[in-house]
Structure formats: C-alpha cells, structure tokens
C-alpha cells in the first residue's frame, strides 16, 4: 500500500471530537515539541480501500480554550505552523503543562 507521509498530504482534514479526552501530559515544552515533530515522520494508516485513498493518524494538541467548550469544526492544518504557534503560545502564556488538557484528534489525509 502506498502510504502517504503527513507532511506531503495534499489535503489534511482534522475531525475534532465533541468529547475531550485526557491524555498523558508532557512535562515540558521540549517533550511537547518532540511529539509534534514525530508526527512528521509518521505514516498514515489506510482506513478503507477506496478512492480517493484516505489515511488516518492521531494528533495531540494542547487545548488553549476553557474546558467544556466544543470544538467541532474542520479545517486544514500545517504541522510546522502548528508546532511553532503552539510553542509560541505556550511560551508567551508561560503555561505549566502539568495537568493541562490535550485533545486527541483524528487526522485524515486524502490523496486525490
């Protein structure tokens, strides 16, 4: 199967869950950055044998809004931009990543 690396996907769709899940929290910004960097080398798993082919992986993103607010929209994402913006936000707010809520989001790449 021709798996597509995340950074080369022509279209990336993020399906945001309406229910937020607690996940293991990195205890510093370097670990958070490393999680996002690893996604760039990660391969998508084919969801079905269909055309256009759809591949799926998982993404952990730091939540910056109040807990309980639903985030159920779809939009394209750029991992490099996400990583830099997330780190800038975290550094700017001087967040303590302990006990922070991360979102578990399904990431789908569609190869046209």
UniProtKB/Swiss-Prot annotation:
GO CC annotation: CENP-A recruiting complex; chromosome, centromeric core domain; kinetochore; nucleoplasm
Effect of substituting residue 65 to C: In kis1-1: Leads to defective kinetochore-microtubule attachment
Any one biological process term the GO annotation gives: attachment of mitotic spindle microtubules to kinetochore
Cysteine pairs bridged by disulfides in the record: none
Location(s) in or outside the cell: Chromosome, Centromere; Chromosome, Centromere, Kinetochore
Subunit and interaction comment: Component of the CENP-A recruiting complex composed of at least mis16, mis19, mis19 and mis20.
Protein function: Component of the CENP-A recruiting complex that ensures the integrity of mitotic spindles through maintenance of kinetochore factors mis6/CENP-I and cnp1/CENP-A. Links mis16 and mis18 to recruit CENP-A through interacting with non-sense-mediated mRNA decay (NMD) factors and the SWI/SNF complex. Also links mis18 with the CCAN/mis6/ctf19 complex to promote CENP-A assembly.
Protein's name according to its UniProt entry: CENP-A recruiting complex protein mis19
Source species of the chain: Schizosaccharomyces pombe (strain 972 / ATCC 24843)
Gene: mis19
